[in-house]
């Protein structure tokens, strides 16, 4: 007896729409339902400082050179210097004094690139004050430096020896002519 098999292609569609299924992406939706308003990018309609212009001042570039941190403020007195030094000691930084006899302000001599590194080098006053725990020790060294170089610029630096970076630097003394 002969047996015969007949195969016919059968196409079936399985629709498993369960509760956790996400609907398929059908394209971008119309923006007709969303509010569309063209925004005005002109900020002059929002802000007005016309009344404040009278009390604004311009930094005078003549006779007012830019130095380091805090250079735009009036000179620091001994109590304010002591607070700055106490701050850098609290942070665990090592105080160091540097002085410059000719150019205390930014100028270009050895380097033509922009930025903080402007090619000027200051002379270190003695050695960094490793192990210093009292601000009066730093102020005593500052007085010695002022006595030795009354016409020089003197700055105090806070150096982080772990990260090996200078963390703070400010002018502690300027010559009387400045």
From Swiss-Prot:
* Subcellular location(s) per record: Plastid, Chloroplast
The UniProt keyword set, sorted, is:
Calvin cycle, Carbon dioxide fixation, Chloroplast, Photorespiration, Photosynthesis, Plastid, Transit peptide
Say if the entry is tagged with keyword Plastid.
yes
Segment annotated as transit peptide: 1-54
Coiled-coil ranges (or none):
none
An example of a Gene Ontology BP annotation on this entry? reductive pentose-phosphate cycle
Keyword Plastid recorded = yes
Q: Which Pfam family is an annotated match for this chain, by its short name?
A: RuBisCO_small
In the record, what terms sit under GO molecular function? ribulose-bisphosphate carboxylase activity
Q: What is its main location?
A: plastid
GO CC annotations?
chloroplast
Q: Which SMART domains match?
A: RuBisCO_small (SM00961)
Q: How does it assemble?
A: Heterohexadecamer of 8 large and 8 small subunits.
Question: Beyond the main fields, what else does the record say?
Answer: The basic functional RuBisCO is composed of a large chain homodimer in a 'head-to-tail' conformation. In form I RuBisCO this homodimer is arranged in a barrel-like tetramer with the small subunits forming a tetrameric 'cap' on each end of the 'barrel'.
The record's similarity note reads: Belongs to the RuBisCO small chain family.
Q: Any idea what job this protein has?
A: RuBisCO catalyzes two reactions: the carboxylation of D-ribulose 1,5-bisphosphate, the primary event in carbon dioxide fixation, as well as the oxidative fragmentation of the pentose substrate. Both reactions occur simultaneously and in competition at the same active site. Although the small subunit is not catalytic it is essential for maximal activity.
What is the official name of this protein in its record?
Answer: Ribulose bisphosphate carboxylase small subunit, chloroplastic 2
User: From which source organism is this entry?
Assistant: Glycine max
Name the gene for this chain: RBCS2
């Amino acid at each position: 007896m002969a047996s015969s098999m007949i195969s016919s292609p059968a196409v079936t569609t399985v629709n498993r729409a369960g509760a956790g299924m996400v609907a398929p992406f059908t394209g971008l939706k119309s923006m007709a339902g969303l509010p569309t308003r063209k925004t005005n990018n002109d900020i002059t309609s929002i802000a007005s400082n016309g009344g404040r212009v009278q009390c604004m001042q311009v930094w005078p570039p003549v006779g007012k050179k830019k130095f380091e941190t805090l250079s735009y403020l009036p000179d620091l007195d001994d109590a304010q210097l002591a607070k700055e030094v106490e701050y850098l000691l609290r942070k665990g930084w090592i105080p160091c004094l540097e002085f410059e006899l000719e150019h205390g302000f930014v100028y270009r001599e050895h380097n033509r690139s922009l930025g903080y590194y402007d090619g000027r080098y200051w002379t270190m006053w003695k050695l960094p004050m490793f192990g210093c725990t009292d601000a009066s020790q730093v102020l005593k060294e500052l007085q010695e430096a002022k006595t030795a170089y009354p016409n020089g610029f003197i700055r105090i630096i806070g150096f982080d020896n772990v990260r090996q970076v200078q963390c703070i630097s400010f002018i502690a003394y300027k010559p009387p002519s400045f």
